[in-house]
Design a protein with these regions (language model features):
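A conserved hydrophobic secondary-structure block that centers on an alpha-helix together
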Residues: 126-144, 160, 164
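Conserved PLP-enzyme active-site core in the AAT-like
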Residues: 115, 145-307, 369-373, 382, ...
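Conserved phosphate/anionic-ligand binding catalytic regions in large, soluble enzymes, centered on
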Residues: 269-282, 286-287, 331-335, 418, ...
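Non-catalytic terminal extensions of PLP-dependent enzymes
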Residues: 1-25, 36-77, 86-102, 108-111, ...
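TRNA-binding/sensing appendages of the translation machinery
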Residues: 28-42, 257-262, 687-690
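Alpha-helix N-cap recognition
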Residues: 30, 142-143, 391, 472
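N-terminal export/assembly segments and adjacent metallocofactor-ligating motifs
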Residues: 106-116, 122-124, 137-139
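A structural preference for short, hydrophobic beta-strand core positions in alpha/beta folds
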Residues: 137, 191, 239, 378-379, ...
């Protein structure tokens, strides 16, 4: 085969002689022999994957482009939460197309993630400033999900209240997602008119209200009086606000808002046929501990210098499990970073200018249409005009279409036009001519705002230094580069995080996401305009169904945790349809990922834990006992396979049989699908539903904490209960704002499957298993492998157990992870699934040279620990407890440690050739939570505050 077209050999690390050496170290002659001893025979696939043969990178790109060219790219002014944008080229080139930004992991290790964390702090500051509320999180999945999270937040604040009011002028897709969330949580959703709704009539049972601002039909309302009446009942007020509008109209915090949610898509992010986009949430200080998602805070490092970190993590699923504020894990970090850079680049004045231009162009269109005799119902508007055209809405939409524009059909009597930053005066002239036969000059008639002065924003925003320093491209380019250099991503080193599958995100896979054919479509365009992208999505869904052995796949969920939630809802809706809606018990092994119990709680399920035995496997006797004890109410079991302990459990089919025999369904967590593809599948095993993490198994990048896609595959009987959507003709079960979720980035996985082919996919799985076993073998004599299968082998990851060593040396597992930074590595997964251990997953992409470099680092760290235990190294002042060592630390004039500077920074000779420096010393987590700062001006300003 021509090596220039053999993508699998580019994707998979070890080749030829390297593989033979690795197999020899394990005592095997062939990869097939190794796999036969690891994967249980009774779950092996009987035939190869029924997928097209692998294509070269060039062939795959050409085929995908030919499919996407079937789309029709018209200028779209539909609005309804999605708008045309202009992504500054300096951001596109240096961030979105840069693996230094898109291949990093969630910033759990802040010392090697300061660049991303600074931008997320900028994002929070931007949102807080624009909405007028003091605390903002670091992104949510989309606007609909954010609204649903706000409903939950209100209920948590008022646990005895079971009613929530949603204004009927909120975006329809948002209302659908809220209804889905409420269905199994006992929340009564009232959708109605704010002007006629009396909060006092609900009284103490009212948890909160949600309004859109401006509303979905373009009207800017003053909610001051309405919110006063809501607050009189003790309920909370939520606003879904357009951030671009907030550059010129009054901020929600000014009229009594408790929680503000929305989307940052207008800040330079393409519509993407629905996504991905970074939603936001801000709130009052009193509600900050109830907020879902990541929250970035400021703390200090060991030298007392300011440092960013993830704050208030005890709210989150990986700690609180079924008591968490949300199941959110992967969010939309990369998109939040892009939106924040957009705000940094434009600054306050630039954003105000863009917002003002959008509004004044809308006013120009208003003027010419009304002069031509078309009635427009909303007089207070920002960017959206509601045309009153009795019986003529379809005709108006068709006229616009013939002129090359999409506008929104509201109902038979109304159409709406929402302008954006891409709108030109020529567009206004063309629309006026098409809709009203009116002639207007190409120059817009721009003057004063068209809203009541009470709606005008009076307060400044984004006044912080970050938003007022980088407005030339040179400055911006260098700022981006400085921040990138502070983060360790896959373009620097292996990230061996267990359960995270940090594999290669190949350049050819990433290229299509910047094509207009993939990212420029509005999710609600007419079907004949989206034939290409829907064909691509259909092909991807079909291939994923074949890989999983299921009847159908939905791509709607925007992350793995969202997929879990969607899968559980499919089970619950199926059982309700079958007259078994009372089934509400979910069995979950104690080793499960924290999202499992959190998602179960969101789906209205009662979590019943199942024990694990001394070998880390599910205790089958306890499983059988629990299943039988709860058989009348058993809804499902959530099980990860291979297990979160890195083992192919031999009894997995028996587990499925026990649950089915007691009336339950089997939900398989697909976090470890990288050890299944091409060898076995959820359908072979007996599962009824499984979510996939496209940002793990199928080569989509993690983006530093998102975006992701968490599609769910289901067996035949669950197909009718997959997520619906307004655009699909049935909205029940919608879990995202768009029918296909983050559709544009699904192209990444389409490319991966096309270039790998069935043989490459199977080989990738086999090599992931080989790499993990190689590491386990090489390090097991120093750090015992906690769990393994019957023949002492692991799956695609292994748990190294340093607990005896750390105990004897007076260390913690954190000390090992921080010390690995000095060797140029991101630490493995800690605290999950076994506290105090290290879960290592190398993936198939890492070459033997990188595996050996990691092994060498761990061997040296073992020696460093041993030196502490035997007394040759100081128990308190040593390389582990003081790690990571920054360039500033080792170059300081004064050095008082009992070990040398070279031992601190260059413990192995390979680091002399290339060295990654942690930007800050070890971050003080306790200080950060006790002195919570989630928005800031600059590091320098915070530093002055620390000194005081």
């Amino acid at each position: 085969m021509n090596t220039h077209s053999d993508f699998a050999s580019r994707h998979i690390g070890p080749q030829g002689e390297e593989r033979r050496e690795m197999l020899d170290s394990l005592g095997y002659r062939t990869l097939d022999e190794l796999i036969a001893d690891i994967v249980p025979a009774d779950i092996r696939m009987k035939a190869p994957l029924d997928l097209p043969a692998a294509k070269s990178e060039t062939e795959a790109l050409e085929e995908l482009r030919s499919i996407l060219r079937k789309n029709k790219l018209l200028k779209t002014f539909i609005g309804q939460g999605y708008y045309g944008t202009i992504t500054p080229s300096v951001i596109l080139r240096n961030v979105l197309e840069n693996p230094g930004w898109y291949t990093a992991y969630t910033p759990y290790q802040p010392e090697i993630a300061q660049g991303r964390l600074e931008m997320l702090m900028n994002f929070q500051t931007m949102v807080s400033s624009l909405t007028g509320l003091p605390v903002a999180n670091a992104s949510l999945l989309d606007e609909g999900t954010a609204a649903a999270e706000a409903v939950t937040m209100c209920r948590n604040a008022r646990p005895k209240a079971n009613t929530f009011f949603v204004a009927d002028t909120c975006h329809p897709q948002t209302i659908s997602v809220i209804r889905t969330r409420a269905a199994f949580q006992g929340v009564n959703i009232i959708v109605g008119d704010c002007s006629s709704f009396d909060p006092a009539s609900i009284g103490a049972d009212l948890a909160g209200v949600l309004v859109q601002y401006p509303d979905t039909l373009g009207l800017i309302c003053d909610y001051t009086d309405f919110f006063s009446r809501v607050h009189a009942t003790g309920a909370l007020c939520v606003v879904a606000a357009d951030l671009m509008a907030l550059t010129v109209i009054r901020e929600p915090g000014a009229f009594g808002t408790d929680i503000c949610i929305g989307n940052t898509q207008r800040f330079g992010i393409p519509m993407g046929f629905g996504g991905p986009h970074a939603a936001y949430m801000s709130c009052t200080d009193a509600l900050k501990r109830r907020m879902p998602g990541r929250l970035i805070g400021m703390s200090i490092d060991t030298l007392g210098r300011p440092a960013y970190r993830l704050a208030l993590q005890t709210r989150e699923q990986h700690i609180r499990r079924d008591k968490a504020t949300s199941n959110i894990c992967t969010a939309q970090v990369l998109l939040a970073v892009l939106a924040a850079f957009y705000a940094v680049y434009h600054g306050q004045e630039g954003l105000k200018r863009i917002g003002t231009e959008i509004h004044l162009k809308t006013k120009s269109l208003y003027k010419v249409l009304t002069e031509a005799g078309i009635a427009i119902e909303n007089k207070n508007f920002f960017d959206t005009l509601l045309l009153s055209v009795p019986g003529q809405a379809d005709a108006m939409v068709q006229k616009a279409l013939e002129a090359g524009y999409n506008i929104r059909r509201v109902d038979a009597d109304h159409a709406a036009i929402s302008l954006d930053e891409t709108a030109t005066c020529a567009d206004i002239a063309a629309l006026a001519s098409a809709l009203a036969g009116a002639e207007t000059s190409a120059a817009c008639d721009c003057d004063a705002p068209a809203w009541d002065p009470v709606h005008t924003r009076q307060t400044p925003f984004c006044t912080e230094k970050a938003f007022n320093s980088y407005h030339s491209e040179t400055e911006m380019m260098r700022y981006i580069r400085r921040l990138e250099s502070r983060d360790l991503a896959l373009n620097e080193a292996m990230i061996p995080l267990g359960s995270c599958t940090m594999k290669l995100n190949a350049a050819s896979e990433m290229i299509p996401i910047t094509w207009p054919e993939a990212n420029a479509l509005h999710p609600f365009v007419p079907a004949d305009q989206s034939e290409g992208i829907r064909e691509m999505l259909s092909i991807l869904s079909d291939r994923l169904a074949k890989i999983t052995g299921f009847a159908a796949v939905s791509l709607q969920p925007n992350a793995g945790a969202a997929g879990e939630y969607a899968g559980l809802l499919a089970i619950r809706r199926y059982q309700k349809h079958a007259g078994e809606g009372h089934r509400n018990v979910c069995l979950i092994p104690t080793s499960a990922h924290g999202t499992n119990p959190a998602s179960s709680a969101m789906a209205g399920l009662k979590v019943v834990p199942v024990k694990c035995d001394e070998r880390g496997n599910i205790d089958m006797a306890d499983l059988k006992s629990q299943a039988e004890a709860h058989k009348d109410n058993l809804s499902c079991i959530m099980v990860t396979y291979p297990s979160t302990h890195g083992v192919y459990e031999q009894t997995i089919k028996e587990l499925c049989d026990i649950v089915h025999a007691n009336g339950g369904q089997v939900y398989m967590d697909g976090a470890n699908m990288n050890a299944q593809v091409g060898l076995t599948c959820p359908g072979c095993i007996g599962a009824d539903v499984c979510h996939l993490n496209l940002h793990k198994t199928f080569a989509m990048p993690h983006g530093g904490g998102g975006p992701g896609i968490g599609p769910i595959g289901v067996a035949e009987h669950l197909v009718p209960f997959l997520p619906g959507h307004l655009t699909l003709g049935h909205e029940e079960g919608a879990v995202a704002s768009a029918a296909w979720g983050s559709a544009s980035i699904a192209a990444i996985c389409w490319m991966y499957l096309s270039m790998m082919g069935p043989d490459g996919l199977r080989e990738a799985t086999e090599m992931a298993i080989l790499n993990a076993n190689y590491i386990a073998k090489k390090l097991g004599h120093l750090f015992p492998v906690l769990y393994s299968g019957n023949k002492g082998l692991v799956a695609h990851e292994c748990i190294l157990d340093p607990r005896q060593l750390t105990h004897d040396a007076g260390l913690t597992v954190d000390d090992i992870a921080k010390r690995l930074m000095d060797y140029g590595f991101h630490g493995p997964t800690m605290s999950f699934p076994v506290p105090g251990t290290l879960m290592v997953e190398p993936t198939e992409s890492e070459p033997k040279k990188e595996l050996d470099r990691f092994i060498e680092a761990m061997e040296r760290i073992h020696a460093e620990i041993t030196a502490i235990i035997n007394g040759t190294a100081d128990k308190e002042d040593n390389v582990l407890k003081n790690s990571p060592h920054t360039a500033e630390m080792v170059s300081a004039d004064e050095w008082r440690h009992p070990y040398s500077r070279s031992e601190a920074a260059y413990p192995v000779s390979g680091l002399l050739i290339h060295k990654f420096w942690p930007y800050v010393g070890r971050v003080d987590n306790v200080y950060g939570d006790r002195n919570l700062v989630c928005t800031c001006d600059t590091v320098e300003e915070f530093s002055k505050a620390v000194e005081l």
